[in-house]
UniProtKB/Swiss-Prot annotation:
Disulfide bonds: none annotated. It is a single-pass membrane protein. It is found in: Membrane. This is Uncharacterized protein MJ0418. The chain crosses the membrane at residues 7-27.
Length: 257
């Protein structure tokens, strides 16, 4: 009975410590209102947790990483774009190349981080759905989407993200041509964009930045494009209080905090 009582007390202490840590992290995250978040290299699980919360809300996320390359041991101090976080590992893009970031003692990841400073992009996201769009080129599709963002003139738009699928009439691509297209879109594919090559065309599925969508004509020659219903995420560097009431009454809004 005494042993069972001791185990019970230890379990309570562990549970309380987990709850206190979770509450403190949640308070820090939800009360931050868009400022930076700083972590030491021994706080990777906490850092990844915050990254997931930010990314799941569709906010773009940059970070300053201070540490070293695990292979060469050379110092690393640079800005990266984080696109995923799992366990104690961050997945990011550095100079156009995917890299992984672990804690100070990491050896499997590309970077062993001593310090991580997260920089979420934007303070609010206005999102809405668009009915299917048709066009001859990716520029046509992008222009239609961009026209809808004119409803937010006066706000500081920092990014526009498009989610949905597109059927593209083009040609049947050879293996070499397919690989070249995939190479050009490597970063977006790493972020989750799906490319499906079919006879006489391509199906594109997932999330894509509007600026990337505009440039797809450089890699894919299309004759016709038809989209599914699209979800548009307009990232603005304005707090909820700075967004006009007319917009708040007509659109759904996500805030960082």
């Amino acid at each position: 009975m005494i042993i069972m009582k001791k185990i019970g007390i230890l379990e309570i202490v562990v549970i309380l410590s987990i709850l206190i840590t979770s509450v403190s992290l949640a308070y820090k995250f939800y009360s931050n209102n868009g400022n930076d978040y700083e972590f030491d290299g021994n706080q990777m699980y906490k850092c990844a947790w915050v990254c997931e919360k930010i990314l799941n809300k569709n906010f773009p996320l940059n970070a300053t990483i201070i540490g070293k390359w695990t292979l060469s041991k050379k110092p690393f101090n640079g800005e990266v774009k984080i696109y995923d976080a799992k366990g104690g590992t961050l997945y990011a893009i550095y100079n156009g190349t995917p890299i992984t970031i672990g804690g100070e003692l990491a050896y499997q990841e590309d970077i062993a981080a001593k310090k991580i400073i997260l920089h979420p992009i934007g303070k609010s996201i206005i999102f809405y759905e668009l009915n299917p769009i048709e066009g001859k080129s990716f520029r046509d599709i992008a222009n239609e989407i961009e026209n809808t963002t004119k409803n937010f003139n006066g706000l500081n738009i920092v990014d526009v993200i498009v989610e949905g699928s597109m059927g593209v009439d083009s040609k049947t691509y050879t293996p070499v041509e397919r690989q070249k297209i995939m190479n050009n879109l490597d970063v977006d594919i790493k972020k989750g964009l799906g490319l499906y090559f079919v006879d006489y065309g391509i199906i594109i599925n997932g999330k894509i930045h509007l600026n990337t969508l505009k440039n797809l004509d450089n890699y894919i020659n299309s004759s016709n494009i038809s989209t599914s219903k699209l979800t548009i995420y307009v990232v603005v560097n304005n707090s909820i209080d700075e967004i006009p009431n007319k917009i708040k009454e007509n659109y759904a809004i996500i805030t960082l905090g």
